[in-house]
Amino acid sequence: MSIDRTSPLKPVSTVQTRETSDTPVQKTRQEKTSAATSASVTLSDAQAKLMQPGVSDINMERVEALKTAIRNGELKMDTGKIADSLIREAQSYLQSK
């Protein structure tokens, strides 16, 4: 099937410039800023502990050991165990629906 062009393409003759006024944008930003400064946030103890620098629930030594084992081709995985867990999770999910 062939599609023939019925009329030639014409370029846009002129592009009209859009006049922008910064005052509405600035006014909106000022309103948002004033609303944001009046908010108060209180963190729970658990959240506060997570926000502290240097606190991590990730064992970086274990992560590095796993990376090294993967890189060296030494990581052994029990695919049967993984498959069984996936099936168990899927069954649990479907039963909860």
Swiss-Prot record:
Signal peptide: none
Record's subcellular location: Cytoplasm
Ranges of compositional bias, category Polar residues: 13-27
GO CC annotations on file: cytoplasm
Annotated region (Disordered), positions in chain: 1-40
InterPro entries linked: Anti-sigma-28_factor_FlgM_sf, FlgM, FlgM_C
Keywords from the named record: Bacterial flagellum biogenesis, Cytoplasm, Repressor, Transcription, Transcription regulation
Main location (coarse class): cytoplasm
GO biological process: bacterial-type flagellum organization; negative regulation of DNA-templated transcription
GO molecular function: molecular function inhibitor activity
Family (UniProt): Belongs to the FlgM family.
Domain notes: The N-terminal domain is essential for export and the C-terminal domain possess the FliA binding site.
Function: Responsible for the coupling of flagellin expression to flagellar assembly by preventing expression of the flagellin genes when a component of the middle class of proteins is defective. It negatively regulates flagellar genes by inhibiting the activity of FliA by directly binding to FliA.
Protein name: Negative regulator of flagellin synthesis
Native source species: Salmonella typhimurium (strain LT2 / SGSC1412 / ATCC 700720)
